[in-house]
Amino acid sequence: MKILIAVIPLLAGFLLDCLLGDPYSLPHPIRLIGRFISILEKWVRCRFSSRLVLGGVVMSITVLLTSSLIPLGLLMLCYKLNVWLGVVLESVLCYYMLAARCLRNESMKVYKAIVENDTEKARKAVSMIVGRDTKPLDRNGIIRAAVETVAENTSDGVTAPMLFMGLGGAPLGFFYKAANTMDSMIGYTSEKYLHIGRFAAKLDDVLNYIPSRLTALLMILSAGILNFDIKNAWKIWRRDRRKHASPNSAQTEAVCAGALRVRLAGDAWYFGELHRKPFIGDDIREIENEDIRRANRLMYCTSVLMLALCTGLRAILWGCIL
């Protein structure tokens, strides 16, 4: 029974995410973490103006401890009061940390706009899920950006937090999401964030090292399950998985490019500045709007495989503890 109680929150959290997606109208813990980071950033820039690297370390540790210890305390209290109250709360917390449905919904807005031949609407939709400047993107560039985002965020938004929750429940999942949120907000190499965001960026690279590679391998397996090109997925992953400034981002992008037999990445504009980037994959065929749907299928299949793996891992860990 105790092993069952340990695995229910992760399973229930994923099911809730698949059914409901992000509750945009309700307070979201990750958005609260984002606001906390913004407040701390202003304080750090004021108090550590001449030592921003140190300030970034202080900020990161503060965010990580706060984001993980608060849910840990709440869960300890609820489990002490009633075990099923704890299970319900942890299930909800796990649900908040997964973004599969949100990723699908937002990318499908791009797909629908492309189908309607409304390039401006598609450009606006894709701007909500990518960090690059979208104004220079043509139709194929918009599709490519959406596919890349689904591929990359399969790890960041779904399987990586799932793996951390499998290891340490919701509190460890919040630890990961806090680090990932900091990286997305301050982990840039621009002059503004180079020093204050250095620690957050490096920490995110470390935390994602294993999850991104494990996700890539599961995505290759998913390519075979979905009758995509599994051989090319393996080939392109082996060849192009390091073609990114981040040691982790190209892992799943390379698999997706190979599985779909398209070319992703390449030069992109950020904050009005052109960044030269290598291509990932081969343009065996021209990218098309249906590739957004295919990328989502890859994302969901990979997520289910990771869920099965993490559920087994959590059961084994609790079996050893008990």
Predicted regions and their residues:
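Hydrophobic alpha-helical transmembrane segments
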Residues: 1-175, 179, 187-322
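Glycine-rich phosphate/dinucleotide-binding loop and adjoining beta-alpha-beta core of small-molecule
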Residues: 184
